[in-house]
Swiss-Prot record:
PROSITE patterns: FATTY_ACID_DESATUR_2. Belongs to the fatty acid desaturase type 2 family. Pfam families: FA_desaturase_2 (PF03405). It is found in: Plastid, Chloroplast; Plastid. It comes from Solanum tuberosum (Potato). Homodimer. Keywords: Chloroplast, Fatty acid biosynthesis, Fatty acid metabolism, Iron, Lipid biosynthesis, Lipid metabolism, Metal-binding, Oxidoreductase, Plastid, Transit peptide. This is Stearoyl-[acyl-carrier-protein] 9-desaturase, chloroplastic. Its EC number is 1.14.19.2.
Amino acid sequence: MALNINGVSLKSHKMLPFPCSSARSERVFMASTIHRPSVEVGSVKKAFTPPREVHVQVTHSMPPEKIEVFDSLRDWAAQNLLVHLKPVEKCWQPTDFLPDPASEGFDEQVKELRERCKEIPDDYFVVLIGDMITEEALPTYQTMINTLDGVRDETGATVTPWAIWTRAWTAEENRHGDLLNKYLYLSGRVDMKQIEKTIQYLIGSGMDPRTENNPYLGFVYTSLRKGVTFVSHGNTARLAKEHGDMKLAQICGSIAADEKRHETAYTKIVEKLLEVDPDGAVLAIGDMMRKNISMPAHLMYDGRDDNLFEHFSAVAQRLGVYTAKDYADILEFHVGRWEVEKLTGLSSEGRRAQDYVCGLAPRIRKLEERAQARAKHAKSVPFSWIFGKEIKL
């Protein structure tokens, strides 16, 4: 799934537009591999497995001594990470944007919402639904962060800054899917049962970010991923405004603001890792870039379309909600913010990773040009989320 980041699908899901090292790098001290099941097991269709095969999975690739890096950063995290959380009493809640069911004017408010939604085209709804489903798979994302060695919430109520951040971040994110879900439900424009099935399939399938229980890789992944969601929700806000639904624009804009705040926090973690362990951190950035940042919803399935995520991504690309150019811009922003080009004292492997990362954005922009050329010949496919209507990719 090359360059598939919540809206970009420049190749099939079979992998990368960029070279990918076939062997593990020398930096890996201890790692185990979860192999594919045997032919006998693999040939049997299982009810609760991803719609397609995930990669051979590497686990616990971070050398054990590196855990000390994250132990030593606990005070830093308490002072520099937790400040990017908002107190619950100061956070917006979904009810702030929705018709009040306890109000005498509830029915009229719902009618007004539905009238506004009549002006919104079906392809926009496809993208908004895809974004909502991605947000609703939040249990998977908290699970992913809690796979990371050295920072996981060991008990479910651990009081380290890392664990506090993960729980509170999850609590803030939980409002996003709730709000979009309720808005779409009230709109009357979508097939909620198909959407709900897609959410259940997605959470059941999990995700395959290839972060290897390694917090270096995990925080690089989340930094870039949060940049993507900020851009995506920001663009859905812009389009909602163009379609005349100012309330929906406000909803998407408020979610985008949260995502930007979270992006800043995760970006600061990688920035700090580059300060205390520049070689280890730049190798992690290079590793994730070579693998390609797969989006959390890349195993999306509705019971019908085996390529649902690719189709949703293609619509998002066509509408300008999230494109390869956006990915290049996000990557360029982070590489500049992290001052990767200025790193010195790196190992030979670190310098190769540095060169690769710094030269990646221009290569992605060339791929964007090819994608635009292919888009002129795009087909149309049905989306169960909008009652099987066909949408151009």
